[in-house]
Swiss-Prot record:
Keyword check for rRNA processing: no
Protein name (database record): Small ribosomal subunit protein uS12
Species name: Hahella chejuensis (strain KCTC 2396)
GO molecular function: rRNA binding; structural constituent of ribosome; tRNA binding
Gene Ontology CC, one term: small ribosomal subunit
Family statement: Belongs to the universal ribosomal protein uS12 family.
Amino acid sequence: MATINQLVRKPRSRKVAKSDVPALQGCPQRRGVCTRVYTTTPKKPNSALRKVCRVRLTNGYEVTSYIGGEGHNLQEHSVVLIRGGRVKDLPGVRYHTVRGTLDTAGVNDRRQGRSKYGAKRGKS
């Protein structure tokens, strides 16, 4: 426990909050261009081929972004919108692509949770 005199000489320092998504620079989303679209494998104990893309953002950052949903139409030079949100079993992937905006198509035949995948309501 510090004495009052010690606190007068050197006050307590505030903890600085570190951003989980530094490339967004405080913005909700950012636009970017895909430089590479590929699949990668998750950490143990999971097993899959996760779809990810490397994105060069408008602010100059280059980040890895996860492509959610079943199937996608992205390729190199596609313009995408990314949002924050990491993928726990993919190290280094801290962003998600937003489906249904810019060059990213929504997920086909999606019935539930459609807003997260840019899917239209469709005929019932």
